[in-house]
Amino acid sequence: MVIQKEKKSCGQVVEEWKEFVWNPRTHQFMGRTGTSWAFILLFYLVFYGFLTAMFTLTMWVMLQTVSDHTPKYQDRLATPGLMIRPKTENLDVIVNVSDTESWDQHVQKLNKFLEPYNDSIQAQKNDVCRPGRYYEQPDNGVLNYPKRACQFNRTQLGNCSGIGDSTHYGYSTGQPCVFIKMNRVINFYAGANQSMNVTCAGKRDEDAENLGNFVMFPANGNIDLMYFPYYGKKFHVNYTQPLVAVKFLNVTPNVEVNVECRINAANIATDDERDKFAGRVAFKLRINKT
């Protein structure tokens, strides 16, 4: 014989919940007395307090082994990469000469990018250094902070400086300037060279034919040793990365040209197939004319 369980009314259910939350007969709150709740809270307070103290101690010990200025571990790849400006999606520099909007965004990006290179700002923040030698600033047992940086003036970029330039870095005339910069690598030395230099060329034979002539600023694409070594963002507060500007004079219009630029120095390898940006950068250039 099946015994049916008596169905409780809504009022009975409410009364049971009220008694569970607070039982006036046993003075229990949610099934526990005040003493029981006090012991539970004390346990979790001690438990989580111990975990917090242990985490804080391990973090403090770890931070004692880490320098505020130089990373303890660095990338296995010691060769700096190259990148271009203006920064574009997929490294495609496309210019429609007759369409101002197509190149005005490039001009605005370059204006902002080159602003810290203004001669007045460089003279205020950085030093005039002796060219052809590394600008080393050892600590010698005492923290030498902040490190000084050498001036790289905007006027060194010649016809690509954008100073008094009505052609907007050449974009309005179909002779655009593309800027090459090296990524920063702490304590990087290029070798015994007097300088490094950037070279550019078409990736394939047909690209070389369509690329035409170009000029580089500073002359020959030189990057002087005085801008090295780099000591890190916190040490080198006002460090200014050296640039090389490439002005393309007569690119074949309406044709996509693949360009590759490389940095040449004794300690820079540009043939590492694992990293396509190690010491080099490839980009596409297209000048559309109607």
Curated annotation (Swiss-Prot):
Biological process, per Gene Ontology: cell communication by electrical coupling involved in cardiac conduction; cell-substrate adhesion; intracellular potassium ion homeostasis; intracellular sodium ion homeostasis; lateral ventricle development; membrane repolarization; motor behavior; negative regulation of glial cell migration
GO cellular component assignments: apical plasma membrane; astrocyte end-foot; astrocyte projection; cell body membrane; cell periphery; cell projection membrane; cytoplasm; external side of plasma membrane
Record-annotated membrane-spanning stretches: 40-67
InterPro entries named among the record's database cross-references: Na/K_ATPase_sub_beta (IPR000402), Na/K_ATPase_sub_beta_sf (IPR038702)
Keyword list, A-Z: Cell adhesion, Cell membrane, Disulfide bond, Glycoprotein, Ion transport, Membrane, Potassium, Potassium transport, Signal-anchor, Sodium, Sodium transport, Sodium/potassium transport, Transmembrane, Transmembrane helix, Transport
Molecular functions per Gene Ontology: ATPase activator activity; ATPase binding; protein heterodimerization activity; protein-macromolecule adaptor activity; transporter activator activity
Location of this chain's protein in the cell: Cell membrane
Gene3D superfamilies: 1.20.5.170, Na, k-atpase alpha subunit
UniProt free text on domains: The C-terminal lobe folds into an immunoglobulin-like domain and mediates cell adhesion properties.
Membership in a protein family: Belongs to the X(+)/potassium ATPases subunit beta family.
Subunit structure: The sodium/potassium-transporting ATPase is composed of a catalytic alpha subunit, an auxiliary non-catalytic beta subunit and an additional regulatory subunit. Interacts with isoform 2 of BSG.
Protein name according to UniProt: Sodium/potassium-transporting ATPase subunit beta-2
Source species: Homo sapiens
